[in-house]
Structure formats: structure tokens, C-alpha cells
Amino acid sequence: MSFRRALSLACGFAGGSAVLVCAAVVADKNGYFGEGRRVTETLAAVNAAHPPAWPTANGWDYNWDKREPSSMVNGKRKESTGENGSQDAENNKPRATRHIFLIRHSQYNLKGDGDKERFLTPLGREQAEFTGQRLASFGLKYDTLIHSSMTRATETANIISKYLPGVELVSCDLLREGAPIEPVPPVTHWKPEAVQYHEDGARIEAAFRRYIHRADAKQKEDSYEIIVCHANVIRYFVCRALQFPPEGWLRLGLNNGSITWLTVRPSGRVSLRALGDSGFMPPDKLTRT
């Protein structure tokens, strides 16, 4: 293979690595490389231009929610009957998709001494109206509206529910705001005590396991669920669901009243259809408190 032909082939693979390829051409012109070495050096330079793959030990974990069908087969029953468990696995196989809308509460009174005094501001109530209208505009049949038991999340959920008549409202203490895991890199403006990570982290992880998982095998139709909670909780949920390093949660930003849309397929695959969408609000109504 001639050097020019090899270089042409390398260009096809390289995409945006034109600078490195041009450097190899100059080297060839000046006779710095032998024919065989020129090809090797060029391809090596092209490969070096590509970003390294993120190091993962096992790739995607399809049993991340401990609901992969084959993992739910009763081992003792399998041994006693001599069956291969394939029928049980088939019976446990989900067939529906879960759509989970994670809503951050609206702007609230930051000067309140406790939760009861940290109610929504007039702007926050207006933001919740926009969010409710946006969710209603999708034309979806929502199954439930779950919300954190904290005042600002409860008030946000109550306003949203006006636009979704007939959707059940459910309060949950597990969804309360907290410190899920120590963020990396650390920040100077927010440093909870270690005990707070210990207490909040276990609770928020429990909330994740309760609400973020593939559908039950008995579920026949796709579901659409709304969860109104807090920025830290939502960001942690997103990192966990996508199998990103969970300690990176604080690198994400969410506006008040924004919509984050997670989809969990029967196979266990998870996709993020929207992160912190607040484009349905006028620019002068956007806040991040």
C-alpha cells in the first residue's frame, strides 16, 4: 500500500484530525520516515487524536434495578423441579415502558426559618402554573403525581395538579431534599457534615430504588408518572439511572419548575429525554434558587 493511499484511508477514519494528518504529510515530504514507518506513524497519530473511552469495568449493568427477568427466578424451585427457569424468566419479563417526569419545585422563600416558612413566592406559584400547563399540553394519561412532603414541593404539586384532573396525589418523605453523596469535585460554598451524607444518602438511595426501575411484569401498558421533588434528588437520580458516576450530580444545574424526563425500557435500558427543560417559561420567569 502506498503512503498516499494509506494517508487517504487514515483521513477517512480521522474525521476532525486534519492537523495531525497534515503533520504526517510534511514529515513524508521531508523524507523523515521510511515507507512502512510512515504508515504506522500516521495511523498512530490519528488514533491519538480521538478522546479516550470512559473507563468502565463491566459496561452497562442490565440488572441495575435487580429486576432483570432471569435474576428473579427462584433458585430453590429451579433445583427441586429440575427446570431451566426459562419459563419463570419469561413470566417475569416486563413488556411496558415507564416514563418518569422529575419536576423541580418552584422558587420559594429562602428567608424562612424552617420548612413551613419556606413556601412558594408569588413568582414560584406562577412558575408552577407554567409547569402544569406544559405537562398538560403533552396530552398524556398520567398515572400518579408523587411529591416530596416538604412545603415547597407540596405546593408546587398542588398547583400542577389543577391542570391534571383525576391524577392521584401522593406525598413521600423519602423524596425530601438532602445531601445524597459527597460531590466530586468538592465546592467551597456547600459543605454538609459527614453525618448528613450518611443519613440523607441512604434515604435518597431508597427513594431511587422505590421509584426508578423497569416496569413490573404485570404492567400491560406504558405508564407516565410525575415526581415533584428537589434539585439534589433529581440530579442524583439522573446520574444513578444513567449509570454515570453519582458523585458528579452537583455538576448539573436545574431551574425551578423544570422538567426532567427519564424513560425506562422493559430491557432495563434508560434514556434521558429531557434534562431541566424550562424553555416553556418566559425568560424573565426563570430562576435557580
Curated annotation (Swiss-Prot):
Phosphorylated by the RIPK1/RIPK3 complex under necrotic conditions. This phosphorylation increases PGAM5 phosphatase activity. The chain crosses the membrane at residues 5-27. GO terms for cellular component: mitochondrial outer membrane; mitochondrion. InterPro entries: His_Pase_superF_clade-1 (IPR013078), His_PPase_superfam (IPR029033), Mito_Ser/Thr_phosphatase (IPR051021). SUPFAM superfamilies: Phosphoglycerate mutase-like (SSF53254). The keyword Mitochondrion applies. Its main location: mitochondrion. Gene3D superfamilies: Phosphoglycerate mutase-like. Coiled coil: none annotated. SMART domains: PGAM. It comes from the Eukaryota. It catalyses: O-phospho-L-seryl-[protein] + H2O = L-seryl-[protein] + phosphate; O-phospho-L-threonyl-[protein] + H2O = L-threonyl-[protein] + phosphate. It is an enzyme of class 3 (hydrolase). Disulfide bonds: none annotated. Keywords: Hydrolase, Membrane, Mitochondrion, Mitochondrion outer membrane, Necrosis, Transmembrane, Transmembrane helix. Belongs to the phosphoglycerate mutase family. BPG-dependent PGAM subfamily. PANTHER family: PHOSPHOGLYCERATE MUTASE-RELATED (PTHR20935), SERINE_THREONINE-PROTEIN PHOSPHATASE PGAM5, MITOCHONDRIAL (PTHR20935:SF0). This is Serine/threonine-protein phosphatase PGAM5, mitochondrial.
